[in-house]
Amino acid sequence: MEQMAHPSSTPLLVAEIGNTTAMFAVFSGTDPIDSLQVATAALSSPEAVGELLQPLLARHSLAADAVISSVVPRAGEAAGRWLLDILPGRVLAVDSTLNLPFRISYDPPSALGADRLSLCARCCMLEEEAAVIALDIGTAITFDVLSADRSYLGGLIMPGLELMASALHERTAQLPRVEVSRPERLMGLSTADCIRSGVVWGCVLQVEGLVRKIRGWLRSEHGEGYARVVATGGRAPLIVSMMEMPPLLDPHAVSRGARYLFELNRITVS
């Protein structure tokens, strides 16, 4: 565990590779200045990665280093191999062996995904000294909890919106496949609307209920007086917009956290 690292002004390429989509962002300091989003399935080989990334890197020729936060091993390896060949600097992969800004307790530590490590690192950048509940609302929905003194206290994993909707279609005889979007009304007037409303509102209320439950657990079990909630992920804007008490929404939270981990580990990767 280490104190806040001062961000470098040198452009850094951050690869955030999720189960469905991948984001490649060029950071200057703590903020992205350019980005490219692609389907993770498109990262099938180093050559495929190169075809996608060359235009982005051509616009930012000063970017010499990269950090990769990937939950899809094959795609992460393809990106890493191409970046190692093309960049003159360092390529760091996020994992639990890095110098982290929080104390980790997970069995085994290597099973805590790069996305969750990066998101927790982002939460350690918050100035206020309070516990944090970190939400990543994507293909899966993860909750990770940090104490005010930045100890990892545990997490939860549940299916995301598309997984819920696809399970209804795939595991029943007649329910249709439905595109998940914000429902027009609470009570559906067609089968598709009923599924859409049930999945989306069910997810909103699950998230709100679990946040309340975790806050109570933090008070009773760990003596934490307040917990900040941070949300990210492809489906976070939809769910957060429907919550009664919306959390801090940071679409770039995982990338910001990965960038922070690169700064904390500059010496060890040089």
Curated annotation (Swiss-Prot):
<feature type="binding site">
    <location>
        <position position="106"/>
    </location>
    <ligand>
        <name>substrate</name>
    </ligand>
</feature>
<keyword id="KW-0173">Coenzyme A biosynthesis</keyword>
<feature type="active site" description="Proton acceptor">
    <location>
        <position position="115"/>
    </location>
</feature>
<keyword id="KW-0630">Potassium</keyword>
<dbReference type="InterPro" id="IPR004619">
    <property type="entry name" value="Type_III_PanK"/>
</dbReference>
<keyword id="KW-0963">Cytoplasm</keyword>
<keyword id="KW-0479">Metal-binding</keyword>
<feature type="binding site">
    <location>
        <begin position="113"/>
        <end position="116"/>
    </location>
    <ligand>
        <name>substrate</name>
    </ligand>
</feature>
<feature type="binding site">
    <location>
        <position position="139"/>
    </location>
    <ligand>
        <name>ATP</name>
    </ligand>
</feature>
<dbReference type="InterPro" id="IPR043129">
    <property type="entry name" value="ATPase_NBD"/>
</dbReference>
<dbReference type="GO" id="GO:0005737">
    <property type="term" value="C:cytoplasm"/>
</dbReference>
<comment type="function">
    <text>Catalyzes the phosphorylation of pantothenate (Pan), the first step in CoA biosynthesis.</text>
</comment>
<dbReference type="GO" id="GO:0046872">
    <property type="term" value="F:metal ion binding"/>
</dbReference>
<keyword id="KW-0067">ATP-binding</keyword>
<feature type="binding site">
    <location>
        <position position="191"/>
    </location>
    <ligand>
        <name>substrate</name>
    </ligand>
</feature>
<dbReference type="GO" id="GO:0004594">
    <property type="term" value="F:pantothenate kinase activity"/>
</dbReference>
<keyword id="KW-0547">Nucleotide-binding</keyword>
<comment type="similarity">
    <text>Belongs to the type III pantothenate kinase family.</text>
</comment>
<comment type="subunit">
    <text>Homodimer.</text>
</comment>
<keyword id="KW-0418">Kinase</keyword>
<dbReference type="GO" id="GO:0015937">
    <property type="term" value="P:coenzyme A biosynthetic process"/>
</dbReference>
<feature type="binding site">
    <location>
        <begin position="16"/>
        <end position="23"/>
    </location>
    <ligand>
        <name>ATP</name>
    </ligand>
</feature>
<comment type="pathway">
    <text>Cofactor biosynthesis; coenzyme A biosynthesis; CoA from (R)-pantothenate: step 1/5.</text>
</comment>
<dbReference type="Pfam" id="PF03309">
    <property type="entry name" value="Pan_kinase"/>
</dbReference>
<protein>
    <recommendedName>
        <fullName>Type III pantothenate kinase</fullName>
        <ecNumber>2.7.1.33</ecNumber>
    </recommendedName>
</protein>
<keyword id="KW-0808">Transferase</keyword>
<feature type="binding site">
    <location>
        <position position="136"/>
    </location>
    <ligand>
        <name>K(+)</name>
    </ligand>
</feature>
<dbReference type="GO" id="GO:0005524">
    <property type="term" value="F:ATP binding"/>
</dbReference>
